[in-house]
Amino acid sequence: MKPLHEILKRPLVTEKTVQQEGEAQVVAFEVKREANKVEIKKAVEQAFEVKVKNVNTVLVAGKVKRLGRTYGKRSNWKKAYVTLAEGSSIDLFGV
């Protein structure tokens, strides 16, 4: 298995993910594109000491951006929605 810091890049904190975290115990992460669901599940369970119920992944296409007269493209990336088991929670901010 790859090291944890290579699989989990960062948590995604948006209005939608904060609402899902409160209602359905779903936490979103940006993960390495090559990571599969089993690796993501093990990484989250190891890093945060929680039980994971389900993992859903989405490949997000990079946007085309304009740089003056030329066009560039941002990299594609992978998003993982991790559903936690009952009684488990992740405190991302430590507040």
From Swiss-Prot:
One cellular component term from this protein's GO annotations in UniProt: ribonucleoprotein complex
RNA-binding as UniProt keyword: yes
GO terms assigned for molecular function: rRNA binding; structural constituent of ribosome
GO BP field: translation
Residue pairs linked by disulfide bridges in the UniProt entry: none
Phylogenetic classification of the source organism: Bacteria, Pseudomonadati, Thermodesulfobacteriota, Desulfuromonadia, Desulfuromonadales
Pfam families: Ribosomal_L23
Keywords, comma-separated and alphabetical: Ribonucleoprotein, Ribosomal protein, RNA-binding, rRNA-binding
Identification of the protein by name: Large ribosomal subunit protein uL23
Subunit comment: Part of the 50S ribosomal subunit. Contacts protein L29, and trigger factor when it is bound to the ribosome.
Protein family membership: Belongs to the universal ribosomal protein uL23 family.
InterPro entries per the UniProt record, alphabetical: Nucleotide-bd_a/b_plait_sf (IPR012677), Ribosomal_uL23-like (IPR013025), Ribosomal_uL23/eL15/eS24_sf (IPR012678), Ribosomal_uL23_CS (IPR001014)
Function summary: One of the early assembly proteins it binds 23S rRNA. One of the proteins that surrounds the polypeptide exit tunnel on the outside of the ribosome. Forms the main docking site for trigger factor binding to the ribosome.
